[in-house]
Amino acid sequence: VPRDVTLLCRGEVQVRDVAEALLLHDDAWGVRALDDGPMMQVCRDATHPVITVLGVRRVDELDEVTRLLPDAPALPVPLWWVDTVTPFDADGERGVTAALEASLDLDAVCIVHGD
């Protein structure tokens, strides 16, 4: 079962921007596109993903964020909602740490679900 991690970015981002910010956590990691590009997976090697960036959506209504993430802090809109998932294992923990660090570079709030 994967763990969901949501990034709420104050500025416009694309999937590649998020993947590049995640890669800063470990310079030995790599990235690969899934499904011809709409999703990107950050991996520690060819067979061990640490976090997958599923997509980015612009959100223009704070009510939508509040409805889906009632514990999220109030942020100005528009914002960019980034969906990611990590494995529920040691690699996934590395992915969560990378997401928390990337949130600083992306001017984002990072919400780790299931913690």
Please report, for each region that a protein language model flagged, where it lies by residue:
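Acidic (Asp/Glu-rich) sequence patches and key acidic residues
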Residues: 1-115
